[in-house]
């Protein structure tokens, strides 16, 4: 299986047995990126507070999704697929409606952006290493149902057959 340790960034390990494992990849995007971007954009650098806001947000207000391009009669199965994180903010600013942008929506958009980035890497490494199960763990996921839900959905977005598990421990 693949073990994805998400903290400030992401470290991806391929686990062949309890005694045999190797680091196969990672990325610099993780909780540190979420906190830094959140501080810069909405002035909040507390992880728990960011997640509280994200729980109340609707990213479709500021992300461009497939729904924005669908005609009335088109298939809506994937209408919420994100095409561009924060993609609608530019129009809010052009229309003079910058103060209508909600911190909650930005928090959720940023969380989705980080989670989709993380899962794209982990699913690609799982495929490259012929593995069908990913275990996510670390401070980013610990006892966090919203993060775990997004990671699960995003992993399935990249590969519907991937098995996703969560461990509530950190190393």
What does each model-found stretch correspond to?
Residues 1-5, 26:
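Short glycine-aspartate micro-motif
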Residues 3, 9-15:
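Short beta-strand scaffold segments in enzyme catalytic cores
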Residues 6-9, 131-144, 167-168:
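Glycine-rich beta-strand-to-loop/alpha-helix junction loops that act as flexible
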Residues 13-17, 21, 144-153:
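Short Gly/Thr/Asp-enriched flexible loops that form oxyanion-binding sites at enzyme active sites
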Residues 18-71:
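Glycine-rich phosphate-binding loop plus the immediately following alpha-helix
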Residues 75-133, 140:
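Adenine-nucleotide phosphate-binding core of ATP-dependent small-molecule kinases
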Residues 151-171:
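Conserved phosphate-binding/catalytic loops in two-lobed NTP-binding clefts
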């Amino acid at each position: 299986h693949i073990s994805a340790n998400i903290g400030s960034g992401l470290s991806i390990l391929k686990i062949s047995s309890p005694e045999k494992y190797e680091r196969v990849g990672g990325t610099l995007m993780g909780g540190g990126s979420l906190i830094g971007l959140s501080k810069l954009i909405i002035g909040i650098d507390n992880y728990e507070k960011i997640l509280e806001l994200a729980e109340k947000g609707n990213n479709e207000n500021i992300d461009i999704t497939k729904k924005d391009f669908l005609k009335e009669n088109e298939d809506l199965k994937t209408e919420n697929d994100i095409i561009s994180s924060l993609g609608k903010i530019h129009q809010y600013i052009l229309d003079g409606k910058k103060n209508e942008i909600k911190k909650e929506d930005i928090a959720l958009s940023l969380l989705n952006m980080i989670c989709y980035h993380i899962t794209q890497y982990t699913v690609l490494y799982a495929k490259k290493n012929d593995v069908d199960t990913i275990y996510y763990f670390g401070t980013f996921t610990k006892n966090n149902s919203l993060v775990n839900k997004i990671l699960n959905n995003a992993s399935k977005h990249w590969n519907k057959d991937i098995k996703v598990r969560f461990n509530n421990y950190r190393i």
